[in-house]
Amino acid sequence: MLYSPESFKVSTPSDREIVIERDFNAPRRLVWDAFTKPELVRRWLLGPDGWTMPVCEIDLRVGGAYRYVWRKESTGTNMGMGGVFREVARPERLVATEKFDDAWYPGEAVDTTVFEERGGITKVRLTVLYESKEARDTATRSGMEHGMVAGYNRLEEVLASLIETGAF
């Protein structure tokens, strides 16, 4: 299920939040793994074409850290971010802080990702809570949804491949 207005939804329920929802044709435990295992995260969390992820470190426990660094191969540009896990409720919910190395919005954000499965379809709901309306507005103007659409489309392909090969 590649991008369509029905499969990828973005909303702003408050002046400090962005909520992104997407359905995946895969069981929840597999989608959870794709969000939490570095060898799977590297295959899809890349944004637009031309980016790689040379650093993907995940210490999946409360108080554990994660670190991602992306590289745009054509320019050599790096973009890094990291945070700390506040809640890990396998396979239902992740809560973690988020801060970019070169912050393009003020402050730190808190990401809450919820995984809900119904009939073999897993809905992922990411709620990003920013420190201020200014930070939220900066994020909404950034075009971040384009990179997320590309990444989530890639994730759908990774999940389909794992199911097809029985590799999960």
Please report, for each region that a protein language model flagged, where it lies by residue.
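A short, structured loop/turn motif at beta-sheet edges
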Residues: 28, 59-61, 86-93, 114-123
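Hydrophobic/aromatic beta-strand elements that line small-molecule binding cavities or substrate pockets
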Residues: 22, 55-58, 81-87, 98, ...
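Short beta-edge strand/loop motif at the mouth of beta-sheet-based domains
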Residues: 8, 19, 39-78, 166-168
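Hydrophobic pocket/interface hotspot
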Residues: 31, 41, 66, 85, ...
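Hydrophobic ligand-binding cavity/cleft-lining segments
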Residues: 1-51
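Intrinsic-disorder/low-complexity, polar/charged segments enriched in Ser/Thr/Lys/Arg/Asp/Glu/Gln
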Residues: 15-21, 53, 65, 80, ...
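A conserved amphipathic terminal alpha-helix motif
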Residues: 1-3, 131-168
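Beta-strand/loop substructures that line and gate deep hydrophobic ligand-binding cavities in soluble
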Residues: 17, 95-149
